[in-house]
């Protein structure tokens, strides 16, 4: 059924997502970075991820 195929697609997408290490998606504050989008939270300053102000 259509319901089944939708569930299968979702499952595949989930499996693909979990295979990636977290580091490829974002990096924690204090870790070296090149672009802000690499950081889990906050901007990339002086080559390192800094926590966003709300985290302090």
Swiss-Prot record:
It is found in: Secreted. Expressed by the venom duct. GO terms for cellular component: extracellular region. Its main location: secreted. Keywords: Disulfide bond, Ion channel impairing toxin, Knottin, Neurotoxin, Secreted, Signal, Toxin. Belongs to the conotoxin O1 superfamily. This is Conotoxin Bu12. It comes from Conus bullatus (Bubble cone). The lineage of its organism: Eukaryota, Metazoa, Spiralia, Lophotrochozoa, Mollusca.
């Amino acid at each position: 059924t259509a319901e089944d195929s939708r569930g299968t697609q979702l499952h595949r997408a989930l499996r693909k997502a979990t295979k990636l290490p977290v580091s490829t998606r974002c990096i924690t504050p204090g870790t070296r970075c090149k672009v802000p989008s690499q950081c889990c939270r906050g901007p990339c300053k002086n080559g390192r991820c800094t926590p966003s102000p709300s985290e302090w």
